[in-house]
């Protein structure tokens, strides 16, 4: 059978192991072909091809449900669930998503782009199944990196109290997250990975104990604890943590042996209780470059399949904001040993890999544990350290209570750098950094800022670290503006002080962060139509520069706000509130992301769809305020 002929995963039923291995080769070929052309997640999917095929051989996916954690590893799932022909459109505008999406396929049982949610979701489905008297299977597939997330451990803690609930967790252990996993749990899994399999030991021990005279199945109730002790003595330490938490443990299983995987999954289904199958896979399996560099090939832009090298862009791009941040923080750490960089499994993405390599004693990776990262930093700041927590905007949402309760209320000097703030592009709704202005603007004591360019980023970073309270600095994804940066001597900003970039009298444009450059371009287009804008770089949304904004608003009487974030509760709302609180009743046109989910597309495509390109904004401003003038 050809992969292209698969329209339903149940068509895998009855295929021989050799036929499944041939389909596995076709999946890898298609996966590599598409990702090398248009970019996407590479290593995770290549590592779970055999796991996917073996699992789906043991399930009836007209009824059974599988929840894939994150979605990085779900490209093979997409290819065997009828999306072979659409796969060329992966992560492109109006194409299929890079993550699972319930609206995209009946086989995408739960959408996710953030880690550690699968066990909770699948357990919820299992409980719903039992409540309705149904008998389908519920499976969660989670990576070893995602297992470090507190939510995953909370779900395991719950599932272990439900001994009569059939529920399967598959641990896809490739010894990697996006970067190598960290922590005691990762160390434990490393030990287990090297141990002999405990595939069927739990059942065999139970059967053996039943046949032992005096302590078998007729054991008196009051001596059952002795029977349990005998069983624990017979079971080696492999998987002991999961066994003690109420799961039957099977593994570690070689994750690229289809026959063994099928046998193991079938055995797990028969147990009718919580089971954890530990599958050891190789991230990037089948593509030597991805196997050799599992961090670099986690996700890739377009690349040459033969050489494995990225295809350079048509023209050189300026250094990214993330790298400028990483370089600057490294310089600061070299000068001040109390400054500590903290990340949650995103060293390379946030630019902290530079600190990790050069001054590892001033670097901490907590794994996929954003809540812990925030409160860890709070504790460090209590005793004189200067933590700088670098987390993607979309992931910091997961620690909202900690931001309020542990940092904001106590007014602790913790610096947060929110990477990927604003529109991020092809990763879609789960990764857009559109909410941070709104969700952080109400937190007490926080200072919120965003730079217009990379030079201002440097000044804001030193401002944050020097400040005696909590700060949050948002930076966009991608390249900077190409302005000159400094190696040292960065001048701190005055908290809450904006700047006038252009004087004008017809319209007041107040822009924040990445939208400042767009405001300048919009201003140029307005000037071409004989309209004179005054442009302010706000720099701060909390506190706002009242002394700058209020007199100009009073004078010009027409205000436009620009932000790369959701309008609800955002920067524009802050300006409206400021004007209202000061009894200035004038029209305000807020430009930003409306109350919509921003789907996967290129950043420019998304901005065009949202009306955030300079030509669109200039026309909308003219129409909103009827600013057409005679030339």
UniProtKB/Swiss-Prot annotation:
<dbReference type="InterPro" id="IPR033248">
    <property type="entry name" value="Transketolase_C"/>
</dbReference>
<dbReference type="GO" id="GO:0008661">
    <property type="term" value="F:1-deoxy-D-xylulose-5-phosphate synthase activity"/>
</dbReference>
<feature type="binding site">
    <location>
        <position position="174"/>
    </location>
    <ligand>
        <name>Mg(2+)</name>
    </ligand>
</feature>
<dbReference type="InterPro" id="IPR049557">
    <property type="entry name" value="Transketolase_CS"/>
</dbReference>
<dbReference type="InterPro" id="IPR005477">
    <property type="entry name" value="Dxylulose-5-P_synthase"/>
</dbReference>
<feature type="binding site">
    <location>
        <position position="287"/>
    </location>
    <ligand>
        <name>thiamine diphosphate</name>
    </ligand>
</feature>
<keyword id="KW-0460">Magnesium</keyword>
<comment type="function">
    <text>Catalyzes the acyloin condensation reaction between C atoms 2 and 3 of pyruvate and glyceraldehyde 3-phosphate to yield 1-deoxy-D-xylulose-5-phosphate (DXP).</text>
</comment>
<comment type="similarity">
    <text>Belongs to the transketolase family. DXPS subfamily.</text>
</comment>
<comment type="subunit">
    <text>Homodimer.</text>
</comment>
<keyword id="KW-0808">Transferase</keyword>
<dbReference type="Pfam" id="PF02780">
    <property type="entry name" value="Transketolase_C"/>
</dbReference>
<dbReference type="GO" id="GO:0009228">
    <property type="term" value="P:thiamine biosynthetic process"/>
</dbReference>
<feature type="binding site">
    <location>
        <position position="174"/>
    </location>
    <ligand>
        <name>thiamine diphosphate</name>
    </ligand>
</feature>
<dbReference type="GO" id="GO:0019288">
    <property type="term" value="P:isopentenyl diphosphate biosynthetic process, methylerythritol 4-phosphate pathway"/>
</dbReference>
<dbReference type="InterPro" id="IPR029061">
    <property type="entry name" value="THDP-binding"/>
</dbReference>
<dbReference type="InterPro" id="IPR005475">
    <property type="entry name" value="Transketolase-like_Pyr-bd"/>
</dbReference>
<protein>
    <recommendedName>
        <fullName>1-deoxy-D-xylulose-5-phosphate synthase</fullName>
        <ecNumber>2.2.1.7</ecNumber>
    </recommendedName>
</protein>
<dbReference type="GO" id="GO:0016114">
    <property type="term" value="P:terpenoid biosynthetic process"/>
</dbReference>
<dbReference type="InterPro" id="IPR020826">
    <property type="entry name" value="Transketolase_BS"/>
</dbReference>
<dbReference type="InterPro" id="IPR009014">
    <property type="entry name" value="Transketo_C/PFOR_II"/>
</dbReference>
<dbReference type="GO" id="GO:0000287">
    <property type="term" value="F:magnesium ion binding"/>
</dbReference>
<keyword id="KW-0786">Thiamine pyrophosphate</keyword>
<keyword id="KW-0414">Isoprene biosynthesis</keyword>
<dbReference type="GO" id="GO:0052865">
    <property type="term" value="P:1-deoxy-D-xylulose 5-phosphate biosynthetic process"/>
</dbReference>
<dbReference type="GO" id="GO:0005829">
    <property type="term" value="C:cytosol"/>
</dbReference>
<feature type="binding site">
    <location>
        <begin position="145"/>
        <end position="146"/>
    </location>
    <ligand>
        <name>thiamine diphosphate</name>
    </ligand>
</feature>
<feature type="binding site">
    <location>
        <position position="370"/>
    </location>
    <ligand>
        <name>thiamine diphosphate</name>
    </ligand>
</feature>
<feature type="binding site">
    <location>
        <position position="72"/>
    </location>
    <ligand>
        <name>thiamine diphosphate</name>
    </ligand>
</feature>
<comment type="pathway">
    <text>Metabolic intermediate biosynthesis; 1-deoxy-D-xylulose 5-phosphate biosynthesis; 1-deoxy-D-xylulose 5-phosphate from D-glyceraldehyde 3-phosphate and pyruvate: step 1/1.</text>
</comment>
<keyword id="KW-0479">Metal-binding</keyword>
<feature type="binding site">
    <location>
        <position position="144"/>
    </location>
    <ligand>
        <name>Mg(2+)</name>
    </ligand>
</feature>
<dbReference type="GO" id="GO:0030976">
    <property type="term" value="F:thiamine pyrophosphate binding"/>
</dbReference>
<feature type="binding site">
    <location>
        <begin position="113"/>
        <end position="115"/>
    </location>
    <ligand>
        <name>thiamine diphosphate</name>
    </ligand>
</feature>
<dbReference type="Pfam" id="PF13292">
    <property type="entry name" value="DXP_synthase_N"/>
</dbReference>
<dbReference type="Pfam" id="PF02779">
    <property type="entry name" value="Transket_pyr"/>
</dbReference>
<keyword id="KW-0784">Thiamine biosynthesis</keyword>
């Amino acid at each position: 059978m050809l992969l292209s002929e698969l329209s339903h995963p149940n068509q895998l039923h009855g295929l021989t192991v050799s036929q499944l291995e041939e389909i596995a080769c076709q999946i890898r070929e298609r996966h590599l072909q598409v990702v090398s052309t248009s970019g996407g997640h590479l290593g995770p999917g290549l590592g779970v091809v055999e796991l996917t095929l073996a699992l789906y051989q043991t399930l009836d996916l007209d009824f059974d449900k599988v929840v894939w954690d994150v979605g990085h590893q779900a490209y093979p799932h997409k290819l065997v669930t009828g999306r072979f022909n659409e796969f060329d459109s992966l992560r492109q505008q109006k194409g299929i998503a890079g993550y699972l999406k319930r609206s995209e396929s009946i086989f995408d049982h739960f959408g996710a782009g953030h880690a550690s949610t699968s066990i909770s979701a699948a357990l919820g489905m299992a409980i719903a199944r039992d409540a309705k008297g149904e008998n389908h299977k519920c499976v969660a597939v989670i990576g070893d990196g995602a297992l470090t997330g507190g939510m995953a451990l909370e779900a395991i803690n719950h599932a272990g109290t439900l001994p009569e609930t059939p529920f399967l967790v598959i641990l896809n252990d490739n010894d990697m997250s996006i970067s190598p996993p960290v922590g005691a749990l990762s160390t434990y899994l490393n030990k287990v990975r090297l141990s002999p399999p405990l595939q069927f030991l739990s059942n065999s021990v139970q059967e053996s104990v039943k046949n032992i005279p005096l302590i078998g199945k007729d054991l008196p109730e009051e001596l059952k604890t002795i029977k349990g002790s005998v069983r624990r003595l017979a079971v080696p330490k492999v998987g002991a943590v999961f066994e003690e938490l109420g799961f039957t443990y099977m593994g570690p299983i070689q994750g690229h042996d289809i026959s063994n995987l099928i046998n193991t999954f079938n055995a797990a289904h028969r147990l009718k209780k919580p089971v954890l199958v530990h599958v050891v896979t190789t991230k990037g399996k089948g593509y030597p470059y991805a196997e050799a560099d599992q961090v670099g090939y986690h996700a890739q832009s377009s690349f040459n399949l033969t050489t494995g090298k990225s295809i350079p862009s048509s023209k050189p791009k300026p250094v990214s904001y993330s790298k400028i941040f990483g370089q600057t923080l490294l310089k600061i750490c070299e000068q001040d040993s109390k400054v500590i960089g903290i990340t949650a499994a995103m060293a390379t993405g946030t630019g902290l890999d530079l600190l990790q390599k050069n001054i590892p004693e001033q670097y901490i990776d907590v794994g996929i544990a954003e809540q812990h990262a925030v409160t860890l930093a709070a504790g460090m700041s209590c005793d004189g350290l200067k933590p700088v927590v670098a987390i993607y905007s979309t992931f910091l949402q997961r620690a909202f209570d900690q931001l309020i309760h542990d940092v904001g209320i106590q007014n602790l000097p913790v610096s947060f750098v929110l990477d990927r703030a604003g529109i991020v592009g092809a990763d879609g709704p789960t990764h857009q950094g559109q909410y941070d202005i709104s969700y952080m603007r109400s937190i007490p004591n926080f200072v919120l800022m965003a730079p217009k360019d990379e030079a201002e980023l440097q000044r804001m970073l030193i401002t944050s670290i020097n400040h005696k309270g909590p700060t949050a600095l948002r930076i966009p994804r991608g390249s900077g503006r190409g302005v000159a940066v400094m190696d040292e001597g960065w001048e701190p900003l005055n908290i809450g002080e904006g700047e006038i970039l252009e004087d004008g009298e017809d319209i007041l444009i107040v822009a924040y962060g990445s939208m400042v450059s767009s405001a300048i371009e919009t201003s140029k287009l307005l000037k071409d139509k004989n309209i004179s804008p005054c442009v302010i770089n706000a720099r701060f949304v909390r506190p706002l520069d009242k002394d700058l904004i209020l007199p100009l608003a009073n004078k010009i009487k027409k205000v436009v706000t620009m932000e790369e974030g959701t309008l609800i509760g955002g920067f524009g709302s802050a300006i409206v509130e400021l004007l209202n609180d000061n009894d200035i009743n004038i029209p305000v046109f807020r430009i930003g992301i409306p109350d919509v989910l921003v789907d996967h597309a290129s950043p420019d495509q998304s901005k065009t769809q949202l009306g955030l390109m300079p030509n669109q904004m200039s026309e909308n401003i003219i129409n909103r305020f009827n600013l057409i003038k005679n030339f």
